[in-house]
Structure formats: structure tokens, C-alpha cells
């Protein structure tokens, strides 16, 4: 996908905010803990290759990604610190990971056996992290016998270096800690079965550190908080108060490319879902669902100059229209998303409008949008 650098529309990423969020996370670690910055999904839409060096400078000890290709992107960006892939990869790719010093997760004995054949053929050793499903219902070992079999298989097996063992919490951002406590108990039980001792045991995620969940963890996998967003922000939920302030890093700006007056009874957009009840001023913004600004944003208010104006008519593939209170000139700035968390068009408010979470909104902004990095 071509990035539209010649279009008046861009995501602005505040590097000073990224640095400060990283430093704050680092400062709140317990003695001996390491900070692994989660930059999967293009750093939650913010730009992984550009931000990883900034996080590294601010104190990151390593990085987490979702897939091997994301890890390879970081290596191409000259990142030399540890990289852990969190999602399962084909065993056939184990040699590629090993050759690039990228660690992979393991969830089955069958995968280990397949990977060993690949590694033996290439004469490589792979760093692995044993994934435990302690209650997420996703990847990882959950049955004692399966885990014991893997433990036995790894005894003296030099095709693998057991670098880590980890789990992921389903509800660390919840005020009700009962399921969180259950997962901790389950993980500790699985840990007790392991005689091949990993270098790192890690369970803490963004929510665990922000909300002071007291769990022994060698690594904190810090994700959404890096970008200044509170993980306790599901639609209609009560936000938990984080242990330190977060500074949102993303804003989304464009401008009016066209302004016209329409008369009473005139329709706007596909299906004419907006019909002018009187003579109205309509402005066009060059952003659409092909950029991740989806059709459900119809009715959401964006800031045109100093005024919040509703989106009228259906969002088109490449453009959307807003109802203006009066005639304003083409070229007037339009702020689709504000970095101010209290603004009506913050990422959180946008997520509320879409009945989703701000993770999803940020991640859906794709590579057609230019990303401009400010405050270096």
C-alpha cells in the first residue's frame, strides 16, 4: 500500500510522549526487572520501526512482537536487543528466527519435534519461551501431562535454549481480582512442574504494572501504555487509576478540501442518509474507510478549526463530509483524533462511539496514512 504523503491527512506521533511513557514504565519496575516494549501491529498503529529506537533510548531492554516478520522488521531497523515473538509461528521458520536471534513461543511437543529437525539441519540453536495457558483460552500449555512431556523432551536438548516461560492475564485491568488470582495460582503450579529452568519468568503486562498487581516477574511486557493509553478502557467500563500518568502520543489531522452550500432537501453521501433540513454548509475531508476511518464514524464529531462538527452522510472510501455551522474556507484544519484524553474526539471517545476499544481504533489506521513524528 502506498503511503499518501502528498495528501493533507496524517497521523502525528509525539515522540516526547513515547519517551516519557517508556521512562515512566522503566522507573516503576522492581529491582532486577526488565522492560520489554510491545510493538506488535506496527506499534499499535504508531510505527514500530520508527519508535523502537526511541523506546530503546528511553530504557527498553527488549521488544515483543506478534509474528516473526515484525521481529525481522526490527532487526532491519538495527535493533539488536532481545526480540520475543508472542504468537505461534510455523516450525519451518524456526531456523530463520534463530539466525536472526529472535525468540519464539512454544505450545506443543509436536512443534518442538518439527522445529528440532529444521534446526539440526542448519546447525542452529533457537531461544524459546514456554507459553502457559493459565486461563486466557488462547495459546499455551494447560494440561500437566503435556507440559511434563515437554519438560522431559528439553532435558539436555541443545537445539533449544529455554529462555523464558510466560502467560498472559485475561483481566489484569479489572477491579475484581478473583480471576487474575486464579491465573497466577495456575501459572505457579505449572512453573513447579518445570525442571528445565528458564532465564526469565514473565507474566506482567501493561495492566499489571499500571495497577500495581503484585506478581513476581522477571520481565514486564509493556504495551498499550507506551502509547499513552489506559488498558482499562472498555466501552462503558470504569477506568482504573494507573500508577503513573500516561501521555497519549497519537493525533490525526487533515483539512477541508472543499466547501459548498447545499439547499433544503439535498442529500449527502451514498444512500443520501443525510438530507438537508435547511440550507447547509458542507465540508469535505480527504479521509475514508480505506484509511481505517470506517463508516461507523457517521455522526461522530471532528474538530473543524475551533468547532466540533458532525460527520454527515456515509463515510466514503476516500472522503467524508461534515456539517459546518457556517461557511468556512477550504484548507481549514480538521482534527479527527486529539491527543488530549479529555477531548470529545480523543481516541477513547472515538472507541466509545464505535463500541470498541482504543487498541482497535489505533490499529486500524493503515499504511496509506502518512505518519509524522514530532518533538524529537
Curated annotation (Swiss-Prot):
Named cofactor requirement(s): pyridoxal 5'-phosphate
Lineage of origin: Bacteria, Bacillati, Bacillota, Bacilli, Lactobacillales
EC id: 5.1.1.1
Catalytic activity: L-alanine = D-alanine
Positions annotated to bind substrate: 138, 317
Protein's name in the database: Alanine racemase
InterPro entries according to UniProt: Ala_racemase (IPR000821), Ala_racemase/Decarboxylase_C (IPR009006), Ala_racemase_C (IPR011079), Ala_racemase_N (IPR001608), Ala_racemase_pyridoxalP-BS (IPR020622), PLP-binding_barrel (IPR029066)
Keyword Membrane carried by entry: no
Protein's UniProt keywords contain Lyase: no
Active site: 40, 270
Protein species of origin: Lactobacillus delbrueckii subsp. bulgaricus (strain ATCC BAA-365 / Lb-18)
Record SUPFAM superfamilies: Alanine racemase C-terminal domain-like (SSF50621), PLP-binding barrel (SSF51419)
Residue positions where N6-(pyridoxal phosphate)lysine is found in the record: 40
Membrane spanning stretches: none
Amino acid at each position: 500500500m502506498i503511503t499518501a504523503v502528498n495528501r493533507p491527512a496524517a497521523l502525528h506521533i509525539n515522540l516526547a510522549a513515547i519517551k516519557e511513557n517508556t521512562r515512566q514504565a522503566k522507573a516503576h519496575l522492581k529491582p532486577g526487572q526488565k522492560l520489554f516494549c510491545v510493538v506488535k501491529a506496527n506499534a499499535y498503529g504508531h510505527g514500530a520501526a520508527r519508535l523502537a529506537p526511541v523506546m530503546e533510548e528511553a530504557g527498553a531492554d527488549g521488544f515483543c512482537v506478534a509474528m516473526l516478520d515484525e521481529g525481522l522488521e526490527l532487526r532491519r531497523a538495527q535493533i539488536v536487543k532481545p526480540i520475543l515473538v508472542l504468537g505461534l509461528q510455523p516450525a519451518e521458520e524456526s531456523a530463520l528466527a534463530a539466525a536472526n536471534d529472535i525468540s519464539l513461543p512454544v505450545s506443543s511437543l509436536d512443534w518442538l519435534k518439527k522445529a528440532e529437525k529444521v534446526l539440526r539441519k542448519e546447525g542452529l540453536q533457537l531461544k524459546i519461551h514456554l507459553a502457559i495457558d493459565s486461563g486466557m483460552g488462547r495459546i499455551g500449555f494447560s494440561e500437566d501431562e503435556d507440559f511434563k512431556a515437554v519438560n522431559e523432551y528439553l532435558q539436555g536438548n541443545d537445539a533449544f535454549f529455554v529462555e523464558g516461560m510466560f502467560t498472559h492475564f485475561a483481566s489484569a485491568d479489572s477491579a475484581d481480582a478473583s480471576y487474575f488470582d486464579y491465573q497466577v495460582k495456575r501459572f505457579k503450579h505449572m512453573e513447579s512442574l518445570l525442571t528445565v529452568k528458564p532465564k526469565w519468568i514473565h507474566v506482567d503486562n501493561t495492566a499489571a504494572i499500571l495497577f500495581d498487581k503484585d506478581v513476581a516477574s522477571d520481565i514486564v511486557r509493556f504495551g498499550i501504555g507506551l502509547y499513552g493509553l489506559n488498558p482499562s478502557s472498555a466501552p462503558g467500563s470504569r477506568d482504573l487509576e494507573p500508577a503513573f500518568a500516561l501521555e497519549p502520543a497519537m493525533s490525526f489531522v487533515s483539512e477541508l478540501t472543499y466547501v459548498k452550500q447545499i439547499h433544503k432537501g439535498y442529500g449527502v453521501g451514498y444512500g443520501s442518509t443525510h438530507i438537508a433540513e435547511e440550507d447547509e454548509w458542507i465540508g469535505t475531508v480527504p479521509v475514508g474507510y480505506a484509511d481505517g476511518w470506517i463508516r461507523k464514524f457517521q455522526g461522530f464529531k471532528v474538530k473543524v478549526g475551533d468547532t466540533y462538527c458532525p460527520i454527515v452522510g456515509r463515510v466514503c472510501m476516500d472522503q467524508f463530509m461534515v456539517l459546518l455551522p457556517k461557511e468556512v474556507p477550504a484548507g481549514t484544519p480538521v482534527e479527527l483524533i486529539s491527543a488530549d484524553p479529555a477531548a470529545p474526539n480523543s481516541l477513547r471517545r472515538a472507541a466509545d462511539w464505535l463500541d470498541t476499544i482504543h487498541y482497535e481504533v489505533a490499529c486500524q489506521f493503515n499504511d496509506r496514512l502518512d505518519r509524522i513524528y514530532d518533538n524529537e
